[in-house]
Design a protein with these regions (language model features):
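Short secondary-structure subsegments characteristic of cysteine-rich extracellular domains
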Residues: 233-245, 531-541, 866-877
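Residues on the lipid-exposed face of transmembrane beta-strands in outer-membrane beta-barrel proteins
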Residues: 133, 163, 204-208, 240-244, ...
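Transmembrane beta-strand segments that form the barrel wall of outer-membrane beta-barrel proteins
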Residues: 148, 219-223, 514-526, 563, ...
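Short, small/polar-rich motifs associated with maturation and membrane association
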Residues: 1-240, 245-246, 251-260, 322, ...
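Glycine-rich, aromatic-lined ligand/substrate-binding cores of catalytic
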Residues: 765-797
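Extended, hydrophobic alpha-helical segments in both membrane/secreted and soluble proteins
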Residues: 105, 238-240, 339, 498-504, ...
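C-terminal structured "cap/appendage" subdomains that terminate the fold
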Residues: 849-878, 892-893
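Surface-exposed loop/interface segments of Gram-negative outer-membrane beta-barrel transport/assembly proteins
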Residues: 5, 63-64, 69, 75, ...
Length: 925
């Protein structure tokens, strides 16, 4: 339990979860725990979420923690296929946890320090989030739970752009040809792509506890429509939890099974969109006198939002199955053994299409049509065996755990690209592309990596094979006439993780608690000389409140000390310690439909010494409570040192190999911080209760040692090719901004006054302070609760303004806010990457307010309980940031990351965060 823990562990139960529209489990606990930063990358339904527990450790991985669902460690990778570029950039993958129905969750525990996470060894460096689902409850005959809600969402904020009249007036004022700019309409393009959306979520559950066992079965259906046209997320889930005791309770059997289907619809948006922008960027910059006809061709090469909406479609489905079976046998009262078998499987396919009417799209879409199918299959199998010895002595207790686990992770799939479609209707285009790819595949004999055809390839369909030696051969062409050019790239990777672990807990007089943990992990991701890593930890806790010298008013007072080593293997990829060769992929089809048959490339070179990143953490904390914990809290301090950073390093030339995955020698990232959490039951009477909880955390991040410098943070926009805003270097925090210092505009020339070179500006995208405040008032059966969240000390690079809101953009015919034209900027000034677009990201948000009424029920009523609730989310935000929302970070696809480094703190036309109101009904019978 948390009270007996020697490490930093926080548990949040269902009654304290956030309410409203919840697409994934992380949102349930956002802001509830000190030192845990949870940020949704955008307001899009199912968008990815970044979680940082006690700072960011790694320079390559996403720094998210390990998620464990009912004892099954999840793979950590994406389970929804990323989208390919069909002319507006690539789509990032969605949240892999969206398959879990939040209503099925009983509690979420967060393991923060090394003494708590070391039992997970090489996967615990970023912390561990343990999700426990609900089990069967209720008496004879069982009970039913039903919940349903309806939500209405609107865009919380829009840009204050020029309307048609003002646009023409400003054009005339600055001497532009108004006749060429006036197309006779008055269009609010933000209003055109945004909408008021309605969403629903419905759950029904049967629960029964029949003495020797229990069962809980649930079914849920939810449909969340986004506030941007053509965006939605549909989730259908079923879950079964069953437990049975046999042989006089010596044998315990458990089964947890989830099946889900998530259907996703995405608008033509992409964090890697070109200078024209995507749907959002085009709506922010489109001429307000353009008509809303999707066939309008007077844009001067710019993208019309009407065209983007009408002639693109991007949909996906993800089927996922998560099953865990356990058997535990008690040989004697002190000794038990447990076997845990887990299986996690997902099948995902995304189809993105742009018809031949998609004017001003990249990659030759207009007049031809583009299509892409991305298939991703993941599978993970787990076998875990543990032996537990628990012995109570006269004045002490001993708990010993020893175990073995084996888990494999397989990822396979294909990426299909099509160019030049005969059809011009979405469903028909998708069917034709799937048919052509499958028909060609059925004709290929033997193993292959790639295949395709194009008009410029006269020998037929090329097939690239890797085994037994890389070779290209040809088979007869398909000649279907349905798709002019086709390219298919396949992949199939498997990783294995084998582990031995042990833990000893020893307690003396329920006052002095000792914990020692050791785990040895062996992974196929690393070199032969370092297949195994060893991760020890130790911790001590002193329950001071059990000492005789402590007064009765002190209900909890516990000192905790811990030290340990954990590891990280994420962000590395597959087989990168060996020399691995494959055929090049990417955008192989040219804008004209030709294909240059790809040749082989070396993806990695031998490095038998490649090993885990290691994080050494020291932590100390104190838990306190007074008057039966009416006032309670905790104070923690920590230092985390991550070394042996994994990186793809270019070799000094001349060299036999141009690059190699290495553990950077002497590399070290340090996080130091302090966390405070306080809860207080201010009023606690029979009829009226008022409680509040507050948490705040400070974290300082620094790259103390690093050999070399690495550019990061790609910036998008016209004239910004190869531009970047961040750099990784020793002496700076992660995600540090590297910019020109901007001091204004020359009053004579209107040119920017700024440095000629980029340099560190002493600012980072990582917040130094995070905090949350929740409070709840209840009077009899009426309850009102509110939750505030805040982040401070960080900066956001406003790439949206850099790309679209400049005087030069207005000269090019784009719309802008009025204040852009009042800065004195010359219309021919270059919009360089500079501190002009760097803004403070501090904010305080009223994230959640819920008013609920628990209807009193007579004993003979059909319903045992009935509750009605109204919830408002994202009601207001206090910030100086001029973008749509300060809690944002663009997430381009993995292939678009500069130097393979993750992006954080850069806002490029991110999907706006909605303001939502939800009416809910919960009934038990």
């Amino acid at each position: 339990t948390v009270k007996d823990a020697t490490g930093a562990v926080t548990a949040v139960t269902a009654e304290d979860f956030n309410q409203g529209i919840i697409n994934s489990p992380e949102q349930l606990i956002q802001g509830k725990t000190a030192g845990v930063q949870i940020s949704q990358s955008s307001g899009e339904p199912g968008a990815g979420i970044d979680i940082r527990i006690r700072g960011a450790n790694s320079v390559r991985s996403n720094n998210n923690p390990l998620f464990v669902v009912d004892g099954i460690p999840l793979s950590g990778g994406n389970t929804t296929a990323e989208g390919q570029n069909i002319g507006v950039g690539t789509n990032s993958a969605k949240n892999p946890l969206s398959f879990i129905n939040p209503n099925d969750i009983e509690s979420i525990s967060i393991l923060k320090d090394a003494s708590a996470t070391a039992i997970y060894g090489s996967r615990g460096a970023n912390g561990v989030v343990f999700i426990t689902t609900k089990s069967g409850k209720g008496g004879r005959g069982g009970s039913w739970d039903f919940s349903s809600n309806l939500s209405i969402a609107t865009v919380a904020k829009t840009f204050d752009l020029l309307n048609a009249e003002d646009y023409l007036e400003q054009s005339d004022f600055f001497g532009f040809n108004v006749a060429e700019r006036n197309f006779g309409n008055s269009t609010d393009w933000q209003d055109y792509i945004f909408r008021t959306s309605a969403s629903t979520n419905n759950n029904i559950a049967y629960s029964n506890n029949y003495g020797t066992g229990n069962v809980r079965a649930t079914f849920s259906y939810g449909k969340n429509f986004g506030v941007v046209e053509n965006t939605s997320l549909e989730r259908i889930t079923g879950r079964l939890n069953a437990n049975q005791r046999l042989l006089n309770d010596k044998l315990k059997l458990g089964l947890q099974a989830t099946i889900s289907r998530v259907n996703d619809e995405v608008a033509p948006t992409g964090a890697s969109a070109g200078f024209r922008g995507d749907l959002l960027g085009s709506a922010y910059s489109a001429n307000p006198t353009w008509p809303t006809s999707p066939n309008f061709d007077g844009t001067g090469g710019l993208l019309s939002p009407a065209t983007a909406l009408a002639y693109t479609q991007n949909t996906s489905f993800t089927d996922r199955y998560l099953v865990n079976f356990s058997a535990e046998y008690n040989f004697i009262s002190e000794l038990s053994a447990k076997v845990n078998v887990g299986y996690d499987n997902s099948t995902s396919s995304r189809t993105a299409l742009a018809t031949k009417k998609a004017r001003n799209f990249d990659q030759g879409a207009f007049g031809n049509g583009l299509g892409a199918i991305n298939d991703l299959d993941t599978e993970s199998k787990l076998l875990e065996v543990t032996l537990n010895y628990n012995k109570e002595f006269s004045n002490s207790s001993l708990d010993v755990l020893a175990g073995y686990s084996f888990q494999d992770f397989t990822r396979s799939g294909r990426n299909v690209s099509g160019f030049g479609f005969f059809a011009d209707e979405f469903n028909e285009m998708g069917r034709d592309l799937e048919y052509v790819a499958s028909e060609v595949e059925s004709r290929i004999q033997g193993d292959y990596q790639q295949y395709g055809y194009a008009p410029n390839i006269s020998d037929g369909i090329f097939v690239n094979r890797l085994f037994p030696e890389p070779a290209t051969d040809f088979i007869p062409n398909l000649n279907s006439g349905l798709v002019r050019s086709l390219f298919v790239d396949t992949f199939d990777n498997t990783d294995e993780l084998q582990s031995y672990f042990g833990r000893v807990n020893y307690s003396i007089a329920d006052k002095y608690l000792f914990t020692a943990t050791m785990r040895a992990d062996g992974s196929t991701r690393f070199g032969k000389n370092n297949e195994y890593g060893y991760f020890p930890s130790g911790a001590f806790a002193w329950k001071i409140h059990n000492e005789d010298f402590v007064g009765d008013s002190v209900s909890t007072l516990k000192l905790r000390l811990g030290v340990g080593i954990t590891g990280n293997q994420e962000g590395l990829g597959y087989g990168n310690y060996t020399q691995r060769e494959r055929y090049a992929g990417g955008d192989v089809i040219s804008d004209g439909g030709d294909i240059n048959i790809p040749g082989t490339v070396i993806l990695s070179f031998p490095n038998p010494d490649l090993k885990w990143e290691e994080t050494l953490q020291y932590a100390a904390g104190i838990d306190f409570g007074f008057n039966n914990d009416r006032l309670n809290g905790s104070l923690d301090v920590y230092r985390k040192e991550t070394t042996d950073l994994l990186f793809n390093v270019l070799s000094a030339q001349p060299a036999t190999q141009p690059f190699q995955f290495q553990n950077l020698p002497g590399s070290k990232v340090v996080n130091e911080g302090i966390e405070l959490a306080i809860g207080y039951d201010i009023i606690d009477t029979e009829d009226f209760n008022w409680n509040t909880n507050f948490n705040i955390a400070y974290n300082k991040n620094l790259v103390e040692e690093l050999d070399g410098e690495f550019n990061a943070g790609t910036i998008r926009g016209q004239g910004l090719s190869l531009a970047f805003a961040q750099k990784l270097k020793a002496g700076q925090p992660l995600f540090s901004y590297f910019l020109r210092e901007f001091e204004g505009f020359d009053p004579v020339t209107g040119q920017p006054i700024q440095n000629d070179i980029q340099e560190f500006v002493g600012k980072s995208a990582l917040p130094e302070l995070t905090g949350g405040l929740s409070t709840s008032w209840s009077y009899k059966d009426l309850t009102l609760s509110a939750y505030f969240a805040g982040q401070f000390g960080h900066y956001i690079y406003n790439n949206t303004a850099n790309a679209f809101f400049t005087a030069g953009a207005f000269r090019g015919g784009r719309n802008v806010p009025l204040d852009v034209l009042q800065t004195g900027e010359s219309f021919d000034a270059a919009a360089d990457v500079s501190t002009r677009f760097l803004e403070k990201g501090d904010f305080v948000r009223l994230q959640n307010v819920t008013l609920s009424y628990n209807w009193p029920m007579p004993e003979d009523a059909f319903f045992s309980s009935l509750m009605l609730s109204v919830t408002g989310q994202n009601l207001f935000v206090i910030t100086d940031y001029t973008g749509l929302d300060p809690e944002v970070s663009s997430s381009p696809g993995g292939d678009d990351l500069l130097n393979g480094l993750p992006v954080f703190g850069i806002d490029y036309a991110a999907y706006p965060r909605p303001r939502t109101f939800t009416l809910g009904l919960n009934a038990k019978f």
